[in-house]
Amino acid sequence: MRLPELRQRLRDHGAAPCHAGRVLRAWVAGRPLDNRRQRAEDFLPLRLRNALPGLFDELRNLAQVHSEHPGEDGSARLLVRLADGQTVESVLLPRDGVCVSTQVGCAVGCVFCMTGRAGLLRQLSGAEIVAQVVLARSRRPVRKVVFMGMGEPAHNLDNVLDAIELLGLEGGIGHKNLVFSTVGDRRVFERLPQSTVKPARALSLHTTDRALRRRLLPRAPDIAPQELVELGEAYARRTGYPIQYQWTLLEGINDTEAELEGIARLLAGRYAVMNLIPYNATEADGFNRPSWARAAEMARRLHRRGVLAKLRHSAGQDVDGGCGQLRARALDAAPVLARRPLPSAETPAASPKAAASIGFPG
């Protein structure tokens, strides 16, 4: 169910804008329609009240917990079953946050990510995205939503922006606490500044070397890291929210001295935060995360060079809950494989035009 369809159905049942807002706020908050000041029967039209039990049943069925995997850090990985039987992952974060998925699978094909191995299976609707937040709120308070789960939000832009608008206007979540993550897609830089709700931004950078980035993110738009940073900086200055750069640390690949110099050159003095995230290793690819001492050293040295760098724990490492791992295990689709080699430097990367030609319906 898409969010415009949900709003239309409410109108068809006699809901005026004030009635629809009341219903949507109750759903997103996971609270009953009645409150201490006003009962639903004194406010909502009878036809709408009669239709709501069936509608709420549909909304509950959009996303249900298939399995839950608590982590020692206070996080919990949820394998979420959708109404058609497909599954995605959500993560309850330690401090009142949730990480949600935007697609079943992913077309970007990052070589260190389990999600992209099966490719893109389908888009999530805006209602399915919001339903993950509702599910999280049934377990703990949620004041922050990060769109960093399975999928590339830029490839499902209309539905993701619909979800962001609902969460920001009716869901009680501050705009800067809605974090849109992307590998870097020009459509995002064009659309987000025009949105009513302007979320914070996270950019998956992972390297300052353009050729290496093509190999790590083989189907991402081929935008030079320098240009990505310039685009990110412009958005940060416009919204007043610092850009978050995501950097999955891979031992011997992007934890080198050359990368340290590259990060300092690109980000020193920028309105930005560099999140260094040691890789969540799996048996299926053979990549390794560097030692914690090496990761901490990188963060310290970047601080000294004028880069606000934070060393992050990847939520769920102790339960092997990296992006796509729970789903792969549930599908029995994670055989032990030899390490996948990086594509050779000669392998042609997907051009922005080629990436745009792939169909990503809204």
From Swiss-Prot:
* Main localization of the protein described in the UniProt heading: cytoplasm
PROSITE patterns tied to this protein: RADICAL_SAM
Q: Which residues bind S-adenosyl-L-methionine?
A: 151-152, 181, 204-206, 280
Which prosthetic group or cofactor does it need? Answer: [4Fe-4S] cluster
Which key words are in the record?
A: 4Fe-4S, Cytoplasm, Disulfide bond, Iron, Iron-sulfur, Metal-binding, Methyltransferase, S-adenosyl-L-methionine, Transferase
Q: Which GO terms describe its biological process?
A: rRNA base methylation; tRNA methylation
Transmembrane stretches, start-end: none
The UniProt annotation places [4Fe-4S] cluster binding at: 106, 110, 113
Please list the GO terms describing molecular function. Answer: 4 iron, 4 sulfur cluster binding; metal ion binding; RNA methyltransferase activity
Spans annotated as Disordered:
342-362
SUPFAM superfamilies named in the record: Radical SAM enzymes
- Annotated EC: 2.1.1.-
Low complexity compositional bias, start-end: 343-362
GO CC, any one term: cytoplasm
- Name the catalytic site residues: 89, 323
Q: Where in the cell is it found?
A: Cytoplasm
Cofactor: binding details: Binds 1 [4Fe-4S] cluster. The cluster is coordinated with 3 cysteines and an exchangeable S-adenosyl-L-methionine.
Identify the residues that the record assigns to the Radical SAM core domain, covering every copy.
92-318
Q: Any keyword Disulfide bond?
A: yes
What the entry lists under NCBIfam families is as follows:
PRK14464.1
Family membership: Belongs to the radical SAM superfamily. RlmN family.
Protein's name according to its UniProt entry? Probable RNA methyltransferase Tbd_1951
